[in-house]
């Protein structure tokens, strides 16, 4: 028999691509299969720090003042490999911080500066983030020096703060507490376009109708942080750009005044770079060759640094003194007429007509040379849009008000995704509490929990009512920006009390009972709601023959309507909740994908999601009391019946509508139960079925209850950063 060699000289003896690229992955073979990867992120396997590492404990060792001094020294320590404009890195560091925080969007709370994700794809290679890799490399000696005591996420934002302070701005404050991730996020949807900077008419565009931007996106193009500086789709028209700005900044959580302040304040210092040919730039960091060592956009064909740098393609500074915080932006904007010109790199920009020589900024390398300042289309929108102009004129006339408004808006921009003040750390945390931080008063902890539980048991509320109300209160939590959750009991306030997903009539009835109990014991309604849910779970476990105590952490407070920005809470309204087998309407996205998104925002793993579904189904918590997925004859008992019957081959499953199925007995043909896609995916998807089979086993009835209680408690305490 002829034997073939295992490999021949010159051939690689490993399997090409299968383990190291996505070309042969399961997703590539079965693109429509439910991808659970978003629930399997940022675990210990990808984290180089040990399980006992605590960033908060490391922060306690940080010499904050020494770090701030080092950062301010860095600003004027120009390096030959990437020289500082006018000898000051402030503009570069501010852009890095701005773009780290500016990817945040309120729609789903994803993006932002809280994780240091600018270090990874796709953000590290976005066109709008060109040359920010240089800023991070300039910071590396400081990160190396302070090590574990400062995260990249904190350092990038603090560098922006110190840049502003070194140029004369009094900042509003700074909070440490952002923790680094160690690989790119898999859960953030950046858009469906397949090319960078695709115009709005391109295939898979994020726009529909007149110019309706797809939710939850905020940026106008794939690869931009906010709007196109040259104009809508690269066509200058400040009034059209103003419309884009309103949508984009609103989706970042900013109003008109904050939008004007951030735009003008961001352009008060630094410059744009476009003095050269963009075609000379090399690949972005993710695509660059090994010898580039993670640096991108390197120019090996011409000088490409200093005055010859190309980044956005726009060329010039906005103000006369680009390394000094002042009111020069508005002075130039209102002092001159502006006309469209092309930069040396071919980008559209606005330049002043007949500007005085002394109003021109000097060259970044030679102070004897002066250049025209520039404005982007977004800058011109601040002058030409009527509402933006009113705000701009006030800032122009009152520089102190502009500085204060910008400082507050900058703090909001850079801290919005950190969540409540309980997560803030450090000596520069502002004493003032701001409404966008969703403040919650501290609640009582010293009370007789067992006495309250006894009162709840005697209240006449059903297991389903108690459990579903607690779930609805807690499910608003978003691990993305740490908003929502049971603390504060905002489920009793507008807008949450009126959300369709919360069944307002039933909710009002339950709250009426629980608020009376809370008042009797002088405790928070928030604690009482969660405690009632725990009581329901304990009673259900007892009905299934298992005695268990659900852990409870007292101390939640009750927020007031004055502490609640009603409009900002609208974005937390659920459009679907697979855990309660409900969705507001049919969507292009399948129900099981919406379930996955909610589970990820709640911080759940796939096994936790699975056990919660199985438990909530048998507890009678379905929205509107529907029977879909209630695969049990003993509703109210915390049994594993959902999994037992889902995996039972005595049944077949027949579709009856877009999102409805009959569970039919094979022998008789009788309909036994009904279900939705969310129910049946736990028997269809191979991974979820593997989990379902674990909980369907005869020897895992107690494990099912224990795991359900653990996952339930995790959700109830998801927003308890104080414990």
Swiss-Prot record:
GO terms for molecular function: catalase activity; heme binding; metal ion binding. It catalyses: H2O2 + AH2 = A + 2 H2O; 2 H2O2 = O2 + 2 H2O. The record marks 95 as: Transition state stabilizer. Binds 1 heme b (iron(II)-protoporphyrin IX) group per dimer. Heme b binds at residue 267. InterPro entries: Catalase_peroxidase, Haem_peroxidase, Haem_peroxidase_sf, Peroxidases_AS. The keyword Chloroplast does not apply. Its cofactor is heme b. Its EC number is 1.11.1.21. Formation of the three residue Trp-Tyr-Met cross-link is important for the catalase, but not the peroxidase activity of the enzyme. Keywords: Heme, Hydrogen peroxide, Iron, Metal-binding, Oxidoreductase, Peroxidase. It is an enzyme of class 1 (oxidoreductase). The active site is at residue 99. One of its GO terms (cellular component) is cytosol. One of its GO terms (biological process) is hydrogen peroxide catabolic process. Bifunctional enzyme with both catalase and broad-spectrum peroxidase activity. Belongs to the peroxidase family. Peroxidase/catalase subfamily. Homodimer or homotetramer. This is Catalase-peroxidase.
